[in-house]
Structure formats: C-alpha cells, structure tokens
A protein has these predicted regions:
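Surface-exposed, low-complexity/disordered segments
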Residues: 1-231
C-alpha cells in the first residue's frame, strides 16, 4: 500500500485458482498486477486466464451451464467486440452514443452511423478490425436485457430498462479487434458501468460459442482487463 498516493497494489507469485460453478469453468488466472486508486476509485487488473470446462454430472447440469453462459455472453464486452467485428451491432441489440463533456456537463449524442463514427477499418491481411472513435468516450447500451437487480441495488441512479457501459479510449490510438472478440491493446481502454460490475464472475473464454447455434471454430486468445467501478 502506497500511503501518499493512496494506492493499493497486489502481485501474485502463483496463478489464482478460480472455480465458477455457475458457468461450469475452472479458471487459472495468472495475475500480473491489481491496482486500486483510492483517490479516483479506479481499479486496474491485468493478467491471463486459462479456462477449463468442468465435467458435468448429467445432461441437466450441462444444459444449466449452457443457459447461464448464454446469459453471461449476451450484452457482454465479448459480445460487443464480436458484433463490431462483424458489423452486427443493431442486430445484436447494441446502441452506441458519444459522450461529450462541456463545463463538466455530460451530453449523450445518438449516432446514425456507428462504424463511420468509430472510424471502422477492416484489415483483410490480418483478419482484424481497427476502430478509433471520433470522441474519447462512448456509451454502449444493450437493449435486449435489463440490468441485474444486484446491480440496480448498488447503483440507484442506473436505468432499469437497459444495460449501460462506458468505454474511454486513449486519444489517437486505435483498438484492434479479432474475429473471436479479443481486442488489443486492452490497457488502452477503461471500462465503467455494467461491464465493470460484471467482471470475472461473468467472464467467458474467447473460444466461447453458443452450442445450440454456433457452427464455426473461433480462435482462442488471452486477455487483460482494465476496469473501473460502476458509474
């Protein structure tokens, strides 16, 4: 703990072992570092998770996990990044707005052209997509699912009609997105709102696919997370 800076830093010498019974995964998380800034209430943790599917005892348990994973996926940042890559934001239930600040007053501006406003560029040589939003902050609204009651209980000012997350980008820095939803450099964006609240409990591997609908193989990658408490 750094008293002058009011900063807590945690390092791990061994991978963290996480058992997620709700989603049916064991996660070996190699934590690089965890930092919490008490002045800003901003948390940053970076690391690399290795997911292993738990062995189900019966078909009912398998179906329960599949249903829970689908709920965790829909509206998640993984879902969002895949939707950006495939230019399917509207079809997936996402809406994007720019957040503009003037004299400490925030204004949300609806967008007509999501991809033009994010300066969407597809690099066919690497099968990646680059985005660099015109505004530093974007609001991501997921309209197909309402927020958890647990989230609403701790965020009284949040809307109960949709899930709202805020993503802050570094100026003049592109974010690269792969087909499986992996994006980099992950340290270059900060996440607030609903996605920050979900965190590891709802984290899915990059090769996740809905077994009832998916037909293609998705590449696996690692991740780091830059997250802040809900706004």
């Amino acid at each position: 703990y750094y008293r002058r800076a009011k900063r807590l830093k945690i390092l791990a010498t061994e991978p963290l072992e996480i058992v997620n019974d709700a989603l049916g995964y064991t996660i070996k998380y190699e934590l690089d570092s965890f930092i919490h800034e008490y002045n800003t209430q901003l948390s940053l943790y970076t690391g690399f998770p290795l997911f292993r599917e738990m062995q189900s005892n019966n078909m009912a348990e398998t179906e329960k996990w599949d249903a829970a994973r689908k709920v965790a996926y829909e509206g998640s940042i993984l879902h969002f990044m895949r939707s950006v890559f495939h230019k399917k934001l509207n079809e997936a239930g996402f809406e994007i707005q720019f957040i503009v600040k003037n004299n400490n007053i925030e204004t949300a501006i609806p967008l007509k052209d999501y991809y033009g406003s994010m300066r969407f560029y597809r690099d066919d040589s690497s099968n990646t997509v680059e985005i660099m939003p015109i505004q530093k902050e974007i609001a991501v609204i997921y309209k197909n699912e309402t927020p958890s009651t647990l989230f609403l209980d701790s965020n009284r000012d949040a809307s109960a009609a949709f899930q709202l997350s805020v993503v802050s980008f570094l100026p003049n820095e592109t974010l690269d997105i792969e087909q499986n939803g992996f994006y980099f450099e992950q340290k270059d964006i900060t996440i607030n709102g609903y996605w920050a609240w979900e965190k590891i409990a709802d984290m899915l591997p990059y090769d996740y696919k809905d077994r009832s609908t998916a037909t293609e193989t998705i590449e696996v990658n690692t991740t780091s997370v830059n997250a802040a408490p809900p706004v």
